Amino acid sequence: MRRAVSQAAALQGVTLAEDAVSSAAFLGSSNPGGSERVALFGAVAHYRYRLRVGPTEHDVVTLHRVVKEDGAWRPARSSRAVFMVHGDGWGFEAAFLSSVGSAYVPPEQSLAAYLAKEGVDVWGIDLRWAGVPEGTQDFRFMKNWTLETHATDVGVALGVARLMRLAGGNFLGNMHLLGWSRGAVVGYAYLNREALLPRALRQVDGFIPMDMAVRFGPRDAQQQAWACERFEALSDARREGRLEGGLLGPAPGMMLRAIGQLAASEPTAPSLLVEPDVFGPGTGRPTNRKLAVVAAGATSVLFAPLQPIVPGYHLLGSTPDAMGLPEQLTFTREGYLFEYGQRAAPYQSLNEVVETEAWACGLDVPYDDRLRHVKVPVLYVGAAGGVGRYGEHSVTLLGSRDVTVLDIRTLPEAARALDYGHADLFLADDARVRVWRPLLQWVRAH
């Protein structure tokens, strides 16, 4: 394993310190290979590997693999592999494997589980911040974590995954890079970096950006202006010494956890997490349940006074009450939402959020200079009530000619505030039919 990490790092132009390499070991030690394995359902299992990628205790990523087995500890060979990068708030398991352990959906009802059941070799990463433990007070170790840091980590993890696939007899087949939300931004940054390498050394055979924009097109000048406002606000916070947090403020995951926990345990109690009349004059304190449903169905309210990335942006589609506030979720089970909130990672590094806003603002960033040289097939998946069609322009920055757009919508664009949401892509009851099955068909065809 140490040799695999060293080789993968070298491919990215990174030399890891000896102590980092020696710590790039599998979690657990219950078997000779040293990996941690959890049987999920049928012949599908989940493996975790913990990789030290820097000098401090926090410079760690977790590599995940969800795969069919021929037997315990024997991953089946597969000609198709997908490597997943999560976005803000939730790590790999919460984002892509949320069905496992859920009280509301069967274990196979998540994207990673579904693809693995269908024979795809699924890999993914927990970025460094996803593993920072609750209670951390000093975030100076995040000072130099940037999009470049995360893109490099993805490259190392991709390299390890490829070497392990080769060791398992997967000599042929493609590896597709899937990035959701800010994970798509990291994906663009990684592909820009990989374009420096000779074609024979490139690791990604296809790109699946899900519901995110890195640049806005000419007709979306308002969204670019909003990004500039967010960039200025977050830059001010960084100049004042903040190193952790994001659009929801410091420790964003702690708020998300509290919202989910209280909605599940005390749904009818007035929420003490927000001020009275937070949703308008005379509305009083929302119940814990109402706060969770509004946070999911009208997510832009959490960003105030900042504007959201696009108009009507939300995590989950909903139907409104008499005041126009979300009252019932349309596509995702309410209890599943409450579980989801409780699985958020407590903290996040701030730099990549600032850099993303700079990119969307149209400022010069070091992450798109070579995107025109990226010519792998692309599948853009947009949620009509998330980023949706606003993310399609970003794909045109690539040099790819084989481009497919999967637009997940149930309503006209004018009703985007109620339509399929950013996280419905993974949590909705019908996501398997609307999203995952066409995604699988694209993977099999490429």
List each language-model region with its residue ranges.
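Catalytic active-site module of serine/aspartate enzymes centered on a nucleophile-bearing elbow/loop
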Residues: 367, 404-446
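Conserved hydrolase catalytic core segment
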Residues: 184-218
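Alpha/beta-hydrolase fold nucleophile elbow
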Residues: 167-181
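Conserved alpha/beta-hydrolase "acid-adjacent" motif
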Residues: 386-393
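Alpha/beta-hydrolase
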Residues: 222-377, 381-386
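N-terminal cap/lid segment of alpha/beta-hydrolase-fold proteins
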Residues: 21-77
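Alpha/beta-hydrolase active-site loop
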Residues: 142-166
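Short, surface-exposed "cap/lid" segments of acyl-processing enzymes
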Residues: 70-124
